[in-house]
Design a protein with these regions (language model features):
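Soluble catalytic regions of membrane-associated enzymes that act on cell-envelope
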Residues: 206-332
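Membrane-embedded alpha-helical bundles of multi-pass enzymes
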Residues: 1-210
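Short, intrinsically disordered, charge-balanced linker/junction segments flanking boundaries
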Residues: 334-337
């Protein structure tokens, strides 16, 4: 069990390389067959109770490795200030553990559907996607690092999402990744070929869907990304210097249609300070519009992480609120307690 556990954890961990920034979907062709063979070896227990528990155990080890490495970056939110070491550890280990609990019903489904060869492939894919659907909707929803996101490695491959969405796309991606398993026996060899064609079919659909020539709008955008440390953003005495830095970076010789600043560029509530918005727009001489990230207070308890569009006279003409906040990074779960 120790060897299988380590092997399963390894398979789950390397699956992250199928997502951005690596975008190597073919790593799944290694990780999923490894995981499948582990499940194949433990499914021989005739008692459904013990078989189900084994599937939940190894399935969660696979996903724990996947979540641990894939969501490790969230813990960096606690690095800007001392005294949060305990919370950092909770975010590193607690979040993957919670997500594993939420997705566990998917492994129960896999255990009940499991069978030899082709049936096992469908059972594994169905179980994982069921778990992903649950974690995408239960509680506040956490639809991050879905296996369906791996189709984003290419403009053509991602077009299939327009038909299936990411959950069903993920179902087919896992079947594609399990193709090598079906090559091991003659009676499933043809299914192995069929599963191997899933990704090329995705690519072909994307090629046919995208126009051969892309017509670009005659618009010019200026995107600004500064390098300002978090401790300066937390220092109220640095607000003026930060604003000057962004205004300096926004200077160009040519007029642009839109200047874009990053999330929380100026560490104040821009939506609450019209005079500051006007001053900023006076400093941006080459554009009439500024798109910038801001925190918006809509009532005493709700603060939204939003993108706001500011016109040349300092008015906010449009806003877009972020739907899913980063746990521990943008909000503290169970903060009431």
């Amino acid at each position: 069990y120790l060897f299988f556990s380590l092997l399963t954890f390894f398979a789950g961990s390397i699956s992250n390389f199928a997502l951005a920034p690596w975008d190597n979907i073919f790593v799944l062709v290694l990780s999923f067959p490894i995981f499948f063979l582990v499940l194949k070896d433990i499914h021989n227990d005739k008692k459904i109770k013990y078989k189900t528990l084994s599937f939940i155990f190894f399935g969660n080890i696979f996903l724990f490795g996947y979540f641990l490495l894939g969501l490790l970056w969230i813990s960096s939110a606690f690095d800007y200030k001392e005294g949060f070491a305990e919370l950092k550890l909770i975010s590193i280990l607690g979040l993957p553990f919670l997500l594993c609990l939420i997705t566990s019903p998917g492994w129960i489904l896999t255990a009940f559907l499991w069978g030899k060869g082709l049936r096992g492939c469908f059972a594994l894919s169905a179980g994982i996607i069921t778990g992903e659907f649950l974690r995408s909707h239960l509680l506040s929803g956490f639809p991050w690092n879905l296996f369906g996101h791996s189709i984003g490695f290419n403009d053509f491959s991602m077009q299939i999402g327009s038909i299936f969405g990411f959950h069903l796309s993920g179902f087919f991606v896992i079947l594609f990744a399990l193709a090598p398993v079906l090559f091991l026996k003659k009676n499933t060899f043809i299914w192995g070929i069929t599963f191997s064609l899933i990704l090329p079919i995705f690519m072909l659909y994307g090629y046919l869907r995208l126009p051969s020539e892309i017509r670009y709008l005659d618009k010019d955008f200026l995107i600004i990304q500064s390098k300002i440390s978090q401790d300066k953003k937390l220092n109220s005495n640095e607000i003026e210097n930060i604003a000057k830095k962004f205004l300096e970076l926004s200077k160009t010789d040519n007029k642009v249609d839109l200047v874009i600043w990053p999330e929380n560029a100026i560490p104040i509530f821009l939506s609450e300070n019209e005079n500051i918005r006007r001053m900023l727009m006076l400093g941006i001489e080459n554009s009439k519009n500024l798109l910038v990230g801001d925190l918006i207070i809509k009532n005493e308890t709700d603060i939204y992480n939003s993108a706001v569009l500011i016109s040349e006279d300092g008015r906010i003409t449009a806003t877009y609120d972020k739907v899913h906040l980063v746990p521990f990074g943008e909000y503290l779960p169970l903060s009431k307690y």
